[in-house]
C-alpha cells in the first residue's frame, strides 16, 4: 500500500538513479552492449516503483504470483534507443526517468543517460495495460496511475 507521506516527497527521489558500468555489460571492445541500455531501463523502472512505495509483486509475476493472478499486465509495445557516446567499464552514469501518460491504458517511460552531466544516451519505452487473461486493453491500475501522476510533476 502506498503511504500518504509520499504526497509530499520530491519525485527526484524515485526518478533519478545512479549506476556503474560493469565488465559483463560490455562487448569485446569494452563498450556497453546495446541491449544493456534496455535492461538498465527496466531495472531503473523497478527501482523507481519500489522507492515510490509500490511492491514489485503487485506489478510483475513472481515465483509466488503468476501473470493470471495479477489485475493487469504491462507489456512493452514499442521501444527505441539513441546512443550518443560509448560507455566503458567503471563509468558512473545517472539515469533520469520521465513519465508520460498517453491515455487510460498506456504510458511512455523516457530515460536519459548522463555521464558527468552530459547526455550520452536515451530510450523511450511504451507500455500498454492489458487484462492478463483476455489479453485485451484495460485501464491502468490505481497504483500505476498515482505513480504516473506524481512522477510527471515538474522537479
UniProtKB/Swiss-Prot annotation:
- EC numbers for this chain: 3.1.2.28
The signal peptide, as residue positions, is: none
Q: What is the role of the protein in this entry? A: Catalyzes the hydrolysis of 1,4-dihydroxy-2-naphthoyl-CoA (DHNA-CoA) to 1,4-dihydroxy-2-naphthoate (DHNA), a reaction involved in phylloquinone (vitamin K1) biosynthesis.
Provide the protein name: 1,4-dihydroxy-2-naphthoyl-CoA hydrolase
Per its record, the protein catalyses: 1,4-dihydroxy-2-naphthoyl-CoA + H2O = 1,4-dihydroxy-2-naphthoate + CoA + H(+)
Spell out the molecular function terms from Gene Ontology. 1,4-dihydroxy-2-naphthoyl-CoA thioesterase activity; fatty acyl-CoA hydrolase activity
Family membership noted in the UniProt record: Belongs to the 4-hydroxybenzoyl-CoA thioesterase family. DHNA-CoA hydrolase subfamily.
- A Pfam match: 4HBT_2
State the UniProt keywords alphabetically: Hydrolase
> Which InterPro entries does UniProt cross-reference here?
4-hydroxybenzoyl-CoA_TE (IPR050563), DHNA_CoA_hydrolase (IPR022829), HotDog_dom_sf (IPR029069)
Which residues act catalytically here? 27
Answer yes or no on keyword Hydrolase: yes
What top-level branch of life does the organism fall under? Bacteria
The record's Gene Ontology biological-process terms are: phylloquinone biosynthetic process
Q: Does the keyword Hydrolase apply?
A: yes
Q: What is the lineage of its organism?
A: Bacteria, Bacillati, Cyanobacteriota, Cyanophyceae, Synechococcales
Pathway it acts in? Cofactor biosynthesis; phylloquinone biosynthesis; Quinol/quinone metabolism; 1,4-dihydroxy-2-naphthoate biosynthesis; 1,4-dihydroxy-2-naphthoate from chorismate: step 7/7
Amino acid at each position: 500500500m502506498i503511504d500518504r507521506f509520499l504526497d509530499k516527497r520530491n519525485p527526484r527521489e524515485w526518478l533519478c538513479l545512479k549506476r556503474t558500468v560493469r565488465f559483463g555489460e560490455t562487448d569485446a571492445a569494452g563498450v556497453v552492449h546495446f541491449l544493456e541500455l534496455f535492461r538498465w531501463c527496466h531495472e531503473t523502472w523497478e527501482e523507481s516503483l519500489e522507492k515510490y512505495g509500490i511492491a514489485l509483486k503487485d506489478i510483475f509475476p513472481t515465483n509466488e504470483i503468476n501473470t493470471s493472478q495479477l489485475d493487469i499486465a504491462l507489456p512493452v509495445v514499442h521501444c527505441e534507443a539513441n546512443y550518443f557516446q560509448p560507455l566503458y567499464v567503471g563509468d558512473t552514469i545517472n539515469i533520469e526517468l520521465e513519465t508520460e501518460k498517453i491515455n487510460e491504458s498506456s504510458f511512455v517511460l523516457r530515460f536519459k543517460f548522463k555521464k558527468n552531466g552530459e547526455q550520452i544516451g536515451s530510450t523511450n519505452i511504451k507500455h500498454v495495460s492489458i487484462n492478463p487473461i483476455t489479453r485485451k486493453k484495460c485501464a491502468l491500475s490505481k497504483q500505476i496511475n498515482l505513480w504516473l501522476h506524481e512522477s510527471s510533476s515538474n522537479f
